[in-house]
Amino acid sequence: VEEIAAHAKISKPVIYEHFGGKEGLYAVIVDREVQALMSALEAALDSHKRPRMILEDSALALLSYIESHTDGFRILVRDAPQNSTSGSYSSLLGDVAIKVEHLLAEQFSHAHMDPKWAPLYAQMLVGLIAQVGQWWLDERRMSKEEVASHVVNLVWNGMRNLRPSPV
């Protein structure tokens, strides 16, 4: 808050008054980060692209956001209040999973698989990429391109060999 006040050349009480307190300011920050990440992911989930490109672009979109908004991502995954009425990382992942679900259902139909399983696979896929993103937040020994390539390798090669009935 002190940095914001100094940058805006106003006092801290003015900031608190404008946002209704620390919680209001924090909610604005979280909302801004959720919107930035969602915009990047929505652009990557363009259904006019080939499925492998959607996968790679989505992984890179998350990793690029983490790279350029490290503090914002850290707030989303670690510091955001659990009872926040504003957007949250988990609600964002749920929204992304719904978009992925529609893409997978279409692909499942083409592969003669039951599209009723698309919601489950969407959750697994989004969860995998989200967890890798959280890991990469602290472990930057690989470039985002290398990480995305390995995610694509695991997911794509696994998805290509799916069986209609895994039992």
PLM region spans:
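Helix-turn-helix
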Residues: 1-24, 28
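Short coil/turn helix-boundary motifs
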Residues: 47-51, 69, 111, 139-140, ...
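Amphipathic alpha-helical interface segments
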Residues: 61, 65, 69, 128-135, ...
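Amphipathic alpha-helical segments used for helix-helix packing
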Residues: 66-87, 101-105, 134-138
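Short, hydrophobic secondary-structure boundary micro-motifs
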Residues: 74-77, 85, 113, 145, ...
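Generic C-terminal helix-cap and adjacent flexible tail
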Residues: 159-167
